[in-house]
Amino acid sequence: ADNLDFNIAGDISECCPNVLSELTWNDLKIYQVKTGGKVIVNKIIYLQGSLGYGWIIDGENQDSDFLGNNRTIEFSRSNNSADNGNVLDVSFGVGYPFRLGSGQLGITPLVGYSHHEQDLRITGGFQTIPPFGPFPGLDSAYETQWNGPWVGLDLLFKSAKKLTLFGDIEYHWADYEAEADWNLRTDFAHPKSFEHIADGTGIVISVGGSFAITNRLSMNIDLAFQRWSTDPGIDKTFFADGSTATTRLNEVNWDSREIMLGVMFYF
């Protein structure tokens, strides 16, 4: 499940109010397919890569607007559906493998680069404050990209003849960019209503194990956790009359928890 949120201030100096608008996507359920590979070349170069694509099938969205500082005097809130959209994750890394204990323990320092996309949708509008209830036609989009290098450590332990345990930890630096289309806002331009730009960081941790069925085939389970956030950045709004306005993007936060079941082939 994934969660993502962002909030903006009333102006570029984080004033009046310091949180003007806040969007949250909570408990996004995602079906994902993923492929990846690891190879050691000439016993000195370790290469790894992965590609994953997922479909959002369920989730919740909240859109709140405030007149007072620190999320006070909330004058508008809608609670909406977020059961559509997709995600994309690409990562690759290279390192030098160290093998200890007759090869049972493997430790590999890594450097790499990753790219992550989220196409988040907002539908099924329901106005909570003021309590007007459901409203038709909501079909807004918020599309994100996190790109940048990372450093990490890959761990492997062959605990038995058929059982192998593994783990990874990565620290990422990211250029964050996002574009939104707020389809019901007639005063905004379409399909690009506003954009976000910021610098961010992230940490990715995964642990798992594989059980060998044959010499070339194993079953594996992988548990992964990610947490990303940005520094303050820029929110630039594009209006229907061609004008623009810039304010402070206070922060963007994204966390993800996943369980992956799969098969592994050895060549």
How should these model regions be labeled?
Residues 35-39, 90-96, 111-113, 149-157, ...:
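Residues on the lipid-exposed face of transmembrane beta-strands in outer-membrane beta-barrel proteins
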